[in-house]
Regions:
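Conserved core of the sugar-phosphate nucleotidyltransferase
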Residues: 104-195
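Short, high-confidence coil segments that cap the C-terminus of an alpha-helix
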Residues: 41, 87-89, 116-120, 217
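Residue-level detector of anion-binding/catalytic polar loops
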Residues: 43, 63, 217-220
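Short phosphate-binding loop-to-helix
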Residues: 45, 51-109
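A conserved hydrophobic position in a structured secondary element of the catalytic/binding core
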Residues: 48-49, 102, 185, 232
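N-terminal glycine-rich phosphate-binding loop and ensuing alpha1 helix
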Residues: 2-48
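Conserved alpha/beta core of the MobA/IspD/sugar-nucleotide pyrophosphorylase nucleotidyltransferase superfamily
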Residues: 87, 170-248
Length: 248
């Protein structure tokens, strides 16, 4: 199978403008992401709408492509990038540009989901463990899966609701699963899902993947035990710097 990885990265961000170019351990955040992904997927590109990001990627030897500024999601930006890059691809991998600690094994896990020819879309889930505070956090979407590892639903709410137990006991009664926002799609499926109108579930939860479920697409969920640290705010960057120092 032929894989290509696209890292969508835009400069404009409400909470942290320019975060792909923020410096972490002496390198731009986007460079950390690119180096991790390209060590697994030879054909790796950054798709951006900003010259500063484009020039930075080319300066460190990466591949970048300019896209429109009006995309509503990273998935839409990836579809435009693939059309411009050209070539024949079996699977397209979507890695967020603000995930400098994405692990190579996580990318490999998502890729292996496509060993099953019936897989249309794949993503990752990580057990929450007994951290009820994290489970209750609406900024950490939860997944429930079926016996074959396909997503039944994603939600910012705690799913499932554990009846007859105090909230503090929920994590001891059910293995809650956190969604890790790494995606991969069959090439034809990516083209199809970017043409779907926004659905009511997506609007309610503000989770793009619900559009795909609502339209009958199946999402395979690979599992990982590795936590990732996304950079959404300047405070997240400070925490990431402290994390890196702890590794030295």
């Amino acid at each position: 199978m032929k894989f290509i990885a696209i890292i969508p990265a835009r400069y404009a961000s409400t909470r942290f403008p320019g975060k792909p170019l923020a410096t972490l351990a002496g390198k731009p955040v986007i460079q950390h992401v690119y180096e991790k992904v390209s060590s697994v997927v030879a054909d790796t590109w950054v798709a951006t709408d900003d010259d500063r990001i484009f020039n930075t990627v080319e300066a460190f030897g990466g591949k970048a492509i300019m896209t429109r500024t009006d995309h509503k999601s990273g998935t839409d930006r990836i579809e435009e990038a693939i059309e411009k890059i050209g070539g024949e691809w079996d699977v397209v991998i979507n890695v967020q540009g603000d995930e400098p600690f994405i692990h190579t094994s996580q990318i490999e896990t998502v890729c292996r989901c496509f060993d099953d020819p019936s897989t249309e879309i794949a993503t990752l889930g990580k057990p929450f463990g007994d951290n009820i505070e994290a489970i209750s956090n609406p900024n950490s979407p939860k997944i429930v899966i079926d016996k074959r590892g396909y997503a039944l639903y994603f939600s910012r709410s705690v799913i499932p609701y554990v009846r007859g137990k105090e909230e503090q006991e929920w994590a001891l009664s059910y293995p809650f699963l956190k969604h890790i926002g790494l995606y991969a799609y069959r090439r034809n499926v990516l083209k199809e899902v970017t043409r779907l109108p926004q659905g009511t579930l997506e609007t309610a939860e503000s989770l793009e993947q619900l559009r795909w479920l609502e339209n009958g697409y199946r999402i395979k969920v690979g599992q990982t035990d590795i936590e990732t640290i996304g950079i959404d705010t300047p405070e997240d960057l400070e925490k990431a710097e402290e994390y890196v120092k702890g590794l030295v």
